Amino acid sequence: METVPARSSKDAPIENVDRNIVSEEMKLICRQVGISRIYSHQEEAIRRARTGESVVVSTPTASGKSLCYIIPILEKIMSEPNARALLMYPLKALANNQAESFQKFIEAAKRVVAARQNGFTDNVNLGKISRLANCQIKVCDGDSDAREKAEIRAGNTNRIIITNPDSLHWMLPQHASWGKKFFGNLSLIVLDEAHIFHGIMGSNVALLFRRLIRVCNNYGNPTPEFICTSATIRNPSEHVKALTTRNTSSVAESGAPSGDKRFMLWQPAELKLSSKGGGEVSTDDPVAEMKTRKSPNHEAAVFIADLAKNGIRCLCFVESRAQCESVKREVRTILNKDNCLHLSNKIESYRGGYSRAERRELERRLQSNQICALVCTSALEMGIDVGSLDATVHVGVPETSSSLLQQAGRAGRRHGTSLAVVIARENPIDAYYCDKYEELFKRPPEEAFIDPQNEALLTLHLPCAAKELCFDLDSLEFDREMFDLDEDDVAKRKKKYKKLNVEEIFAAKEKVEENLTPFNAALKKLTHKTEITPIAPLMFDNPTNTLRFDKRCEVNPHSAVLLRGNPFGDGWWLVLKPKEGYNGINYEQLLQTPETQAMLEKRKLLVECIDSDRALMRLYVGAIHTTREGTYEVKKIDAMKRIAFCEEYAWNGLATMPKVNENITILDTSVVENCAVRYNRNVLNTRVSLGNVRVEEFVQGYNRFRVTSAEGGKSVSQVEFETPLVCANYRTKSLFFSLPEDVLNKIPSENVFAAILGVRNVCVELASSIAFCSRKDVSSAMKFSNDPPNSKCVIFIYDCCPNGVGLSDKLFECAELLLEKAAYLVKNCPCERGCPLCICSGRGGGRAAGAKKIVKMMLDCMTTV
């Protein structure tokens, strides 16, 4: 048990705040909405924003961060007749929640205006308040249809627009329809939950913001300022500057109160399994053999049921959608058995894949205290209003300290004691923290890494920028400010870069030039034809001396940009196909169209829309799929149409888990035949290569396992497919270490696998800090073979995105740094046998536990010349 002590409030009456920070008009409106006091961090953030600074507020969950941008925006609206604001949220639920918050202030302004017109007077400027009363706030995102979007663009009083990065990406090519009215008067841009925009997604969003600023500059508005909110990370100011280009001041010390928070780390009890004859279980099933403790899902369900019976409202965080539905079902089962039917229907689930109407209804019930426990994925980790909660339950140790604090912060949002129960799963990392629980709460905040100068991403975004506004070659300096390296970037990369002038960019591309800045290299690549791209995306227009997007290109450049890094095409549909057929629907001819979707939803036949990213890991034939409405078994899949057909399934406490395998193949034979030094070199005492690989992930079959009762997780049966189902097959870039025999011979044969696994784990863990990406942007594999020559093993670290986005290139360039950092980290980690902070991190990391000395020996061999 760990206790985070209560924190007292640092606040002041809003009346006492300097009028240059909060105007008299704003104070009056705040009183109308029930705000009489303001926290110290809110006052500081508002002060900085109102003096023209860009600000990032990184105080804890439930500290009132939204007021830090609501008040500056409303002050702008009141004081500047044409001012506009743009707010971006990562989740639709957050957007709608905040629209309601803004609307409360607008309604209060209307009441003030009405009261003053009826003879009441105050020492305020009624004209300013009238501007706010007439202000419209609009949500423009994927849920808005074409008619709604056209009305939003046309409205003169639509001064606050709420959207998300995905929708903004498609707003920019239509900037002329928004015009100077919006982009020319855009004063403040808000980015909520900035910490989640890291890695490839964050780098994409950073380039999106540069395109946004470029459009604003076109309308005479080069300096819109940013207000960002973030969870606790190690580098909030640096991260937001990299995202927005703006020098940013950080407000991190919270003035909001919080009650005691008790963290409890719970390790499920060991199971005493026995056969029906009374003896010990003996099984050839490795999954069953590994399950020696009670199911964490079952333990979570017991905790939630007990909390509900004691009137304690809670959230339960789980990893997957299937787990979400399973835990909810088990909680209801427990409550029904205990004759608590009045509580059973107040247990709900919340996850991705629900319809807009379902999400809104759940949010409404949650905020009005009609739900006593909600089982959810990370979709609720971020700050929509969840009402008054007393506890959180976490199935598994959250991956980062920020996630744990964000999730636990959803309960006990102001006063009183709250509880966070972390239930350990049966894996080495969770077991490690059960042995050394104090380390769980001492984990340092993580850094957020992005790279807006990633050359591969620039080659995607620069054509978008050129289509939005051509590059004026007579005045390219502003574009260089947006997209090129600045002095700090060059110093950080410790490399001499060459910047090209306009003539050099268009010079004949006779050879690959070394040390070009990423912006110059991307421009040079985009203005020259190749065998793959016979029409260069960017063309020179001599009469205007501009660089334009070539409309002859078949691909719309905006379609080529995948902001969230999901490269696997459109999503899948799971469609209910009753055994007897249904009202004449021809299932064989179903196509994914809006009309078909509306028809299926009306008849309640569209079970779920599923994201495309490895959807077949969930939609193989035989898969059991649970939703809020029921349980279904997948009977058929149509890969061409991306539709899976299912039937209703009489749930019997079983679920399915795919048996996934992976294969990685080197495609560049020249790499392993010692071709150019650029792609194959000796680094310290290790052979390091860079090349193209093919990654295949496939489902070989599945396990049926029991999810109810304390023995949840026990395998019941296994199914093998005659032909494995390919769920991902793509070409990408990879860095690989060839470990020669003389290195492996120094390691005892029984320890070789654990040693190589430990080396892989620590290198992948460090890759994000070197390639400025997220842990999820790179993956790894090991392959034992005789290829490349003289090597028994190859460690691969590859880009998870098809065709790669330059991460492996960066790692190859910095291979010495990567290996030296790995050796230093293992040597200086205070653990004795290996821990999640060194060799036991990541997928399968626990199998390296106990091998620290061997890993250290191997890294010493690899780095000693």
What label would you give each PLM region?
Residues 1-33, 37-40, 44, 50-66, ...:
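Helicase motor core with emphasis on the C-terminal RecA-like subdomain
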Residues 497:
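Donor-sugar nucleotide-binding helix/loop cap in glycosyltransferases
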